[in-house]
Amino acid sequence: MVHICRLLVLMGMLLCLSAQFASSQHWSHGWYPGGKREIDIYDTSEVSGEIKLCEAGKCSYLRPQGRNILKTILLDALIRDFQKRK
């Protein structure tokens, strides 16, 4: 039993140390994963009509579809179940 406890402590310490030395993705302020940078659309002189509409709140494709998420998930599950039965 003592050997198992020591082994678990040693494994925990190795896990903590390996997490410190592992190379992980890091991005700086203003940068997003994948090397994409945040672009300030207000600095550009040419703003398309679609962006102006979206700023006014009339853009339907940028709004989160919170009500339809559950409905979509259930419909997809039913379709997959129906296709498996065929």
Curated annotation (Swiss-Prot):
Domain of life: Eukaryota
Molecular function, one GO term: gonadotropin-releasing hormone receptor binding
Predominant cellular place of this UniProt entry's protein: secreted
Modified sites of kind Pyrrolidone carboxylic acid: 25
Alphabetized Pfam families for the sequence: GnRH
Subcellular location as annotated: Secreted
InterPro entries: GnRH, Gonadoliberin
Modified positions (Glycine amide) in chain numbering: 34
Gene Ontology cellular component annotations, sorted alphabetically: extracellular space
Keywords attached to this entry: Amidation, Cleavage on pair of basic residues, Hormone, Pyrrolidone carboxylic acid, Secreted, Signal
Residues in the signal sequence: 1-24
Function: Stimulates the secretion of gonadotropins.
Family, per entry: Belongs to the GnRH family.
Protein name as catalogued: Progonadoliberin-2
Source species taxonomy: Eukaryota, Metazoa, Chordata, Craniata, Vertebrata
Gene that specifies this protein: gnrh2
